[in-house]
Swiss-Prot record:
Changing D136A: Abolishes transfer of prosthetic group to acyl carrier protein. Transfers 2'-(5-triphosphoribosyl)-3'-dephosphocoenzyme-A to the apo-[acyl-carrier-protein] of the malonate decarboxylase to yield holo-[acyl-carrier-protein]. It catalyses: apo-[malonate decarboxylase ACP] + 2'-(5''-triphospho-alpha-D-ribosyl)-3'-dephospho-CoA = holo-[malonate decarboxylase ACP] + diphosphate. HAMAP family: Malonate_MdcG. Keywords: Nucleotidyltransferase, Transferase. Belongs to the MdcG family. Its EC number is 2.7.7.66. It is an enzyme of class 2 (transferase). This is Phosphoribosyl-dephospho-CoA transferase. It comes from Klebsiella pneumoniae. The gene is mdcG. The keyword Transferase applies.
Length: 205
């Protein structure tokens, strides 16, 4: 893979042994290379890519690492909100997918996508969705975004047929949109931990 994987990307590996430093025993029993892992936020002195593995149970999540050369396929959150992908999904009747379809009807001034269990289901067609599933949304924001446009997004998200939360990804980390709009500051999740900030588009001094 030539592109650098980013947090929330789903990546497929060339072999099961490509998954490194996994301690949880259930991973060997449940995970196989045909299933993607999700890129997470972390740093490594060996320049490996931080990933997470999801198991069959909600609480089964394991953190590990992979060498970039062992990644053979990548699906970004943005790729999963192509309207044709959504309309032809076997989960099109589920509320989170209906919510994503509703958001595609408006032209937004930023790139956005779907993560979490909805993203995993759309990418794999594995039935991890149900009627009460949340819709996890991601906005890519390399530059500061217009507050009024974000308020419009939040208004539309509040009207979706499911619970939905939006993370905004800046060059320095990600924060919860509702928290930032409500309080004027938010907890920015970075590769080296979280920090409370009112300026998520600025590097911490």
């Amino acid at each position: 893979m030539s592109a650098t994987p980013r947090p929330h990307d789903l990546v497929w590996l060339n072999h099961a042994s490509a998954l490194e430093d996994i301690a949880e025993p259930w991973v060997a029993q449940q995970w196989r290379a045909a299933l993607p892992v999700v890129v997470r936020r972390d740093v490594d002195d060996q320049a490996r890519v931080p990933v997470g593995v999801r198991g069959m149970k909600r609480e089964q999540r394991a953190a590990g690492w992979v060498q970039a050369r062992n990644i053979v396929r990548s699906v970004t959150p943005e790729m999963l909100v192509d309207r044709e992908v959504l309309l032809h999904s076997p989960f099109v009747s589920q509320p989170p997918v209906q919510g994503a379809i509703a958001l595609t009807l408006h032209r937004w001034p930023w790139g956005w996508g779907v993560t979490g269990s909805t993203g995993y289901a759309l990418a794999t067609e594995i039935p991890v969705l149900h009627a009460a599933s949340d819709l996890d949304l991601l906005i890519r924001a390399p530059q500061p975004l217009d507050r009024e446009a974000l308020l419009e997004w939040q208004t539309r998200v509040a009207q979706l047929p499911c619970r939905a939360d939006t993370q905004v990804e800046t060059p320095y980390g990600a924060f919860a949109l509702n928290e930032w709009l409500r309080d004027g500051r938010a907890l920015l999740k970075t590769s080296r931990g979280a920090r409370l900030t009112a300026t998520p588009w600025h590097r911490e001094e």
